[in-house]
Amino acid sequence: MKIHAIQTGTVAVKTRQREGVGRGKRRLLNTFLDREWTDPLPILAWAIEHPEGVIIVDTGETARASEPGYFPRWHPYFRTGLREWVAREEEVGLQFERLGIQPAEVRWLVMTHLHTDHAGGLHHFPKSEILVSRVELEKATGRMGRVRGYLNNRFPDWFQHAA
């Protein structure tokens, strides 16, 4: 069995978000008011080459996140609380191919959650079985999903039926 950590770009967030200053709405307010940014942090995905098949834990971010208009301008977090840098060659599908893992060979995707820095690479794996908690799926795809920071309009068309 082999385990690979794959960096699919970098992200900077407000220092108070990373430190978890406050609780509930106070924590959110602290994040928005913070003027300090973290150094760039790695956005990671994981591949586990297992005897029963390849398992991917999270799919990292997509290079489309670096394009103007990818994030909703109306959302204050995406406008003021997040900076991402992702090059096309950093996308998870291309990196796994360089390791000799074809996306079509990936048996399972284990999604810790469905924010874009963890689910941005879903489009590379249309044939994989997706494992995600029902609560997380409902939060991400429900009426309030976009307000909660999920880019459910960016999920692949096949995703709703596969999860």
Model regions: which residues?
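Metallo-beta-lactamase
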Residues: 82-117, 134-163
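Conserved beta-strand hairpin/beta-sheet module of binuclear metal-dependent hydrolase folds
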Residues: 8-93
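Active-site flanking residues adjacent to catalytic metal/cofactor-binding acidic residues
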Residues: 57, 112, 132-133
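Extreme N-terminal starter segment of soluble prokaryotic enzymes
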Residues: 1-4
